[in-house]
Amino acid sequence: MKTATRKADSARASAAKKRAAPKAAAKKPARMYRTNLRDVPKVGGLKRRDGWVDMQVQFLIDKKSAGADHVVGWTVLKPGARHENHRHHNCDEFFIVLKGKGHIYTENGEQPSSEGDVVYSPRTCWHGFNNTSNEDVVLVWGWMGAGSIEASGYEVDPATH
């Protein structure tokens, strides 16, 4: 009788193990990513028809370089350069004006912007920047929730073209 009970207990224990949720696969350890502006190539192929007018853009951190699900970028806008009104369907954007001044495009028209301004634009909100000064404008910016321009859902405002 004891043998039959042991066999039944063993069978129940074996079935319970099979029903138990499998252990989560071990995640790769996180790795820090570091780069330098001098080492990151400028983005080529940015087209005026897509709202990129005379801009120097670098993707410092993104999916391709760091496996990130966001982008951190650096942009220099020469006098007269602008990033036309645009929006992102799949991510939020922020930018910080490190140097220079110009105008921010908003859903309510243009507003002046200068060194030290920090701007946040939630997904689908139209925004842009125009360098109206005689000096370079330098921006640090980021897309939160998309690791590439393709993933961001970028759309230029057809009304500006």
Residue ranges and their predicted role:
Residues 90, 109, 125-126, 135, ...:
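A generic "binding-loop/recognition-motif" signal
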